[in-house]
Amino acid sequence: MSDYKFTLNLPETEFPMRGNLANREPEMLERWTKDGLYQQIRDSRIGRTPFILHDGPPYANGSIHIGHSVNKILKDIIIKSKTMSGFDAPYVPGWDCHGLPIELKVEQKVGKPGQKISAAEFREECRKYAAEQVNGQREDFIRLGVLGDWQNPYLTMDFSTEANIVRSLSKVIESGHLHKGVKPVHWCTDCGSALAEAEVEYEDKTSPAIDVAFVAADSKAVAAKFGVSDYSHPVSMVIWTTTPWTLPANRALSLSPELDYSLVEFEKDGVTQALILAEVLVESCLTRYNVESHTVLGSAKGAAFELVRFNHPFLDFDVPAILGDHVTTDAGTGIVHTAPGHGQDDFVVGQKYGLEVANPVGDNGVYKPDTEYFAGQHVFKANDNVVALLREKSALLNHVAYRHSYPHCWRHKTPIIFRATPQWFISMDNHGLRTQALKEIEQTQWIPDWGQSRIEKMVENRPDWCISRQRTWGVPITLFVNRETEELHPDSVSLMERVACRIEQQGIQAWWDLDAAELLGDEAEQYRKVTDTLDVWFDSGSTFSSVVAARPEFHGHGVDLYLEGSDQHRGWFMSSLMISTAMNGKAPYKQVLTHGFTVDGKGRKMSKSIGNVIAPQTVTNKLGADILRLWVAATDYSGEMTVSDEILNRSADAYRRIRNTARFLLANLNGFEPAKDLVAVEDMVALDRWVVRRAAALQQEIIEAYEQYNFHIVTQKLMQFCSVELGSFYLDIIKDRQYTAKQEGHARRSCQSALYLISEAMVRWIAPILSFTADEVWQLLPGERDAYVFTQEWYQGLKSVTLATDLSDDYWQQLLTVRNEVNKVIEQARRDKRIGGSLEAEVTLFADAALTEQLTHIGDELRFVLLTSEAKVLPLADATSEAVETELASLKLVVASSTAEKCERCWHHREEVGTIEAHPTLCTRCVTNIEGDGEVRLFA
């Protein structure tokens, strides 16, 4: 064999079998950075149609987690695939840099502003801390293979962005959407600040649930409304609440106007009294009050009690009964304790009736000094004291511990309160913002489509947006308010532009350093500067304007796509929609795509306490970023995304199949020069033309899946192609031709040409997902080429050519099925030790007329398809008793060990081996390939 070994075309490549990704990827990243890869991509797309994916900014605090990785990888896949489709698709990453979490971190280090450090110095410390966090997160994102303008990202704390945020606010004001009001807002007593809807999480909490009696100021008159005359016992309305601490702020009792209410009399502890309860809740209420027998004295609609007065249970005033649409009979008594300073519904109905918006609670959650009974007590600690006082006043009918879902601060994880404070709001209904936003939602494509109904419900129900915060580190609300009238300065918009110009040069500190007289002159004494800062959701929500509209690489093009986790319907998607609609009357995006949260193999959230956290840094250091990227792409992101060590190991297995395919392709392109060796598709061997045709069809399916953001379909189709059409069929069949045919002959060059075309296409298919591996493949592909695959477009060399004489795709599919059946029988013969390898086998196929016609069409080349030394086709009726039935009714098989000698070069067993004098150990085909013009292949 030593004489003939060098006549074989053995595969050879520098592409290693093992990826060693954890070590090799950082080396590639260095080259990408050194070569300015991102700028090369930008230069390659000058003048092309833009596609703008706007990066929702992660918060600049802490290390990135697996959810961050999912988000950034999905964005990167889209950017790279859009670039492959010819778009100019810049990616400018961003960070959200203001707000409380950073303040808290800096406070731990230097103390609170105004104590050991000035507010100005505190802001500078916050800026430094945020910059450090950005640098750490940036390195982790780059390690994932995400390409972008990492050296010039947008930060909401950039002076230019801060200035543009102020300009965005001025446009909202100019459009008439801003107003100031005393309204109940979510308030965190730990933060000492209002919270946005998106900063509120709901967790279970145990609260005291109490039923409280409000005795009528005139019981006889109230009883009369039920048709009971001259009633002599006390009549009370009963409320049910889980926030006893709000009772000092009670200013009314709300009833539903069309609901039926009963007057129920009973005796307890020797005292006769009558209670007013919703008719449908009488039984459940009296059970709670341990009332064994009662009499219903009458019934009346809620509307009958409008403005009837009832005594507060422990304060020296009475309150009216009022009517509200928010009253339900889901729980409680059908009568709602109404404190306009502590609830949104309460506030709305209170405005209708002109009720006082009482707020006896300070910023820190402690009752103010003038609060009767409870001054100086924290509201949650005061609950027990309120209950005790009600019991003392004989107003408490029931008291139990009640477990329910309750709003918590997303940062402190502590319960929050509703508290009326003077704040700045974007009105949802003045100038039709809510209505227009709902119209814009309809014009936007939501992926998955359930996102539309989700955000619609949120917009329909959301209150006015409180955009002011009482914080130090944030973009200031740069307004001047008249000290007497509380009205905005009439030139607010132009003044804000002048302030924005200063911020552009000096940052937000310019506002606090500003002497009002510099802008207002003699008017300065009439006005005061607003010291509130903007909700950070306004910062990020205005970046479509403050960043996208401002940066040159976006060419003034609107945003095509927002892509974030599903929690952002109420977060960034919402804030961006509101600001854009308020500013421009339209949504800031055309498409909105959401992905699910990551959970472990048991469906649980990632939690340090559970110990199921999978850090992306650990994955890249152990398996490599391409494995993580493949997991992201292969997972249907429309629901929860399950990840575990086992799942990532499965991704690594899938990766190896793709890598092995790429290695086979490269190894068999050794010595192939496309410029001189490429065989035209129409001149190829039929099997080669078929596989190119299959690849061309697959490419269209892959491109379509990329365009629809169905990356799991891309990976499914890629794996199917690598495993079935290539791995189990085509690549197996061509090995013989590739290794043994004449090196320069048509049979081999046809095969190599097909492999080359597939390689050129496949390296592009995988580039958006397996970016590092694609680059590795690209560097080793033969032929002249640009430095990087990422500047390319989808390969145009895949021609779907079908000649008149060609065999159909169905034919090759049938042949694949037959081959699988043959393999089963050969495998059994191998287990029975009747043969060794498949080339020791002679197979006889007993087939019906239709299948016989197909199998004999390719003549002697059938044996190459079946990987046997001989293949005979005989009529099914002639099947011998030893013939094995197959899953095809039209086919039976007999496998026998060949009696012919084995060719030393190709290992086929052929009758002529030993008959050729010059080459006694070779078959005729090998002699032709060594000394002649090379064998001729038509089909396989």
Swiss-Prot record:
EC identifiers of the protein? 6.1.1.5
Q: Where is this motif: 'KMSKS' region?
A: 605-609
The record describes how the cofactor is bound as: Binds 1 zinc ion per subunit.
Q: List the disulfide bonds.
A: none
**Could you tell me which Pfam families the record lists for this protein?**
Anticodon_1, tRNA-synt_1, zf-FPG_IleRS
Q: Which GO biological process annotations does it have?
A: isoleucyl-tRNA aminoacylation
Give the UniProt subcellular location, in the record's own words.
Answer: Cytoplasm
| Gene Ontology terms: cellular component | cytosol
Record-annotated residues binding Zn(2+)? 903, 906, 923, 926
Its cofactor is:
Zn(2+)
Reaction catalyzed: tRNA(Ile) + L-isoleucine + ATP = L-isoleucyl-tRNA(Ile) + AMP + diphosphate
SUPFAM superfamilies noted in UniProt: Anticodon-binding domain of a subclass of class I aminoacyl-tRNA synthetases, Nucleotidylyl transferase, ValRS/IleRS/LeuRS editing domain
Residues binding ATP: 608
PROSITE patterns from the entry? Answer: AA_TRNA_LIGASE_I
Question: Which keywords does UniProt give here?
Answer: Aminoacyl-tRNA synthetase, ATP-binding, Cytoplasm, Ligase, Metal-binding, Nucleotide-binding, Protein biosynthesis, Zinc
Residues holding L-isoleucyl-5'-AMP = 564
Q: What class of enzyme is it?
A: ligase
- What is stated as this protein's family in its record? Belongs to the class-I aminoacyl-tRNA synthetase family. IleS type 1 subfamily.
Protein function: Catalyzes the attachment of isoleucine to tRNA(Ile). As IleRS can inadvertently accommodate and process structurally similar amino acids such as valine, to avoid such errors it has two additional distinct tRNA(Ile)-dependent editing activities. One activity is designated as 'pretransfer' editing and involves the hydrolysis of activated Val-AMP. The other activity is designated 'posttransfer' editing and involves deacylation of mischarged Val-tRNA(Ile).
According to the UniProt entry, the note on domains is: IleRS has two distinct active sites: one for aminoacylation and one for editing. The misactivated valine is translocated from the active site to the editing site, which sterically excludes the correctly activated isoleucine. The single editing site contains two valyl binding pockets, one specific for each substrate (Val-AMP or Val-tRNA(Ile)).
Q: How does it assemble?
A: Monomer.
Query: What is the designated name of this protein?
Result: Isoleucine--tRNA ligase
Q: Which organism is it from?
A: Shewanella baltica (strain OS195)
